[in-house]
Amino acid sequence: MAANYWASTQRRHWLFTKERLADIRESFRERDKAAHSQFPLPDQRLLNIYFSQQLIKLGKRMSTRQQALATAQVYIKRFYTKNEIRHTNPYLVVTTAFYLACKMEECPQHIRFVVAEARNFWPEFIAPDVSKLGECEFALISEMNSQLIVHHPYRTLSELQPELSLTSDEVALAWSVINDHYLTDLPLLYPPHVIAVMAIIVAVVFKPSQTSFHGTAAPLAGAMRDGGMNILAALGDKNGAGPPPRIQKLVGWLAESEVDIRAVIECTQELVSLYEIWENYSEKHCKELLGRMVKSKNLDK
């Protein structure tokens, strides 16, 4: 809960309501129904998974810190609140967001190196001319009004670890949940401290094993849905038998904190939806649809 978040451009300019985001996306569809009909794309969350996987590939080749990858994902989300994806080359946007995020998170990479590595993965979509990335960087900065500082939930997680006596396994699981929330609209909807608290609840209450965290997404989603309602019930019932002491401590802390409990539950439900739809994810399908769109509209030029 970094104090400077409350005065940040992130809080003042880059938090939306669900209704506002839906209106933005609907306006894109209304303005260009032909493109939406000609180039159907998967659910936004499935695209987010695909973009995240591409960023991870790029980041691994350059030993990039997770926070830079997270910042890149936020940049992509912000950019696409101003631009219809069907009028862009998403591979260039992903590469540019990565390049810019590395600079902002103080782990800069040379532009020629970034372009070369991106071409190793997507040679048909990334031109060898580095000026293309430079132009896209200018557009990205302009669309975000030069508001490039991103506050992440990782810091709050670290701050709450001793206060809530979180084990190393719980911290690792909460970290994974925070990573996953970037695959949803949550970074555009809620403050980072709310996301961090949600991640801690998932780690402490549901304790999904890391090996099956995504492999059994549907059962996990059901467990999380039930668990989320149990937490809500516990907060409203101070006299019942209640949950185990470990969870009681967390519930007690939540009840006494100034954290918006309803927002935490809504974030948990959004994560449930992500894990449910994850079962339908196909990297090949996303790649084919995006590739057809980029090539047909000559967006790779």
From Swiss-Prot:
UniProt keyword list: Activator, Cyclin, Nucleus, Repressor, Transcription, Transcription regulation
GO biological process, one term: regulation of transcription by RNA polymerase II
Pfam name, any one: Cyclin_N
SUPFAM superfamilies recorded: Cyclin-like
Gene3D superfamilies: Cyclin-like
Residue intervals of the Cyclin N-terminal domain: 53-142
Keyword Transcription regulation: yes
GO MF annotation, one: cyclin-dependent protein serine/threonine kinase regulator activity
Disulphide bridges, residue numbers: none
Chief place where the protein resides: nucleus
Highest taxon in the source lineage: Eukaryota
Subcellular location: Nucleus
A GO term from the CC aspect: nucleus
InterPro entries, sorted: Cyclin-like_dom, Cyclin-like_sf, Cyclin/Ssn8, Cyclin_N
Role, per record: Component of the srb8-11 complex. The srb8-11 complex is a regulatory module of the Mediator complex which is itself involved in regulation of basal and activated RNA polymerase II-dependent transcription. The srb8-11 complex may be involved in the transcriptional repression of a subset of genes regulated by Mediator. It may inhibit the association of the Mediator complex with RNA polymerase II to form the holoenzyme complex. The srb8-11 complex phosphorylates the C-terminal domain (CTD) of the largest subunit of RNA polymerase II.
Description of how the protein assembles with itself and partners: Component of the srb8-11 complex, a regulatory module of the Mediator complex.
UniProt similarity note: Belongs to the cyclin family. Cyclin C subfamily.
This protein's name: RNA polymerase II holoenzyme cyclin-like subunit
Native organism: Aspergillus oryzae (strain ATCC 42149 / RIB 40)
